[in-house]
Amino acid sequence: MLQVSVLRTRPGFSLEASFAAPTPGIIALFGRSGSGKTTLVNVISGLSVADAGDIRLDGEVLTDTRAGVAVPVERRRIGYVFQDARLFPHLNVTGNLRYGEKRARAAPQVIGFDEVVTLLGLTQFLQRRPRELSGGERQRVALGRALLSQPRLLLLDEPLASLDLARREEVLPYLEALRDHLAIPMVYVSHQFDEVLRLATHVVLLEAGRVLAQGPVNEVSLRPELQSIVGPDLVGAVLEGVVTRLDPDNGSADLAVGRGTLQVSLRDVPVGSRVRLQLLARDVILATQPVQGLSVRNALASTVTAISNDDYGAVLVRLDVGGETVLARITQNALQALKLRPGDAVWTLVKAVSTRGHAFRLASGA
């Protein structure tokens, strides 16, 4: 468990943040630029000092201002990966990785050199200098160096922010591999919700130095505070299920979710795999009667559980779909025409193609 409750005040900005998240896994600090994410990870690392508060990792006190405890940075066993790789230009990849080993000192070994090289796909780059690597390759080396310091916590401060889309997609599978194969908890800073959706096991929403919400990804995805950060087009429920049938020719799969089945757009994921899926509220259609003759592949019996206005003049309808919660975003006119009320039975319609790019494979332990 990572437990944080800290106050840090500087001219023009005040951080007052508290959260508790299970470990291992990836704890995402999500919010707009300037919300306090980097300040918070710097306080956790010990690079910045809290004015008040405490930080505990798996029961061990790292900071307790009342008791006068402030474990020095070098003794916290916390790895840190920045937006830029910060590799030593005069060393090759092997030398940069070995530097991480030197920082480990007498720390218990969490992961070895060969395992890091294999896990991050660095074998072919070991003799290259940083200038000979792409941005994504440099970030993988930075990850490896941090891992070889044998950390008990890894801080990742927007490690993909300086990369273009292609390089970002190159690095993401390696971050998934770290999450799925290592027992090292990670704090991942991002202002891109698709990264959070793909990687995180726990989310902390930050705004203006305050925690707006926290919890598992599927719970936070339903919180109204999220919409204020991501806007209306990215609001939607996050579901997890198991692939029960795969149709590689058509690029689709059946996903067992709750007590029902969804047909989704998904390739190259074996039957039996666990998948995390975001259903965007804008892509969900509601009907009060069964509908025939449509290309929509999913028509699910549902119950309206709540109706609320959003901040953009539309209506968010919360639905129980086979024991899972789904959101639909409709207009005020549609609400009046359908005469919806909590408790009403409706049909929830979702195009399989609308899930393309919003479904990600999870390891069994994620």
Where do the protein language model's features map onto the residues?
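Conserved ABC ATPase "signature" region
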Residues: 60-65, 108-125, 176-177
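ABC ATPase NBD coupling module
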Residues: 62-79, 103
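Conserved ABC ATPase signature
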Residues: 129-133, 137
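A short, proline-enriched helix->beta-strand linker immediately N-terminal to the Walker B motif
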Residues: 148-152
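Catalytic Walker B motif of ABC-type/P-loop ATPase nucleotide-binding domains
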Residues: 154-158
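Internal alpha/beta loop-helix hairpins
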Residues: 180, 190-260
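Glycine/charge-rich catalytic "coupling/switch" loops of P-loop NTPases
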Residues: 261-308, 325, 329-366
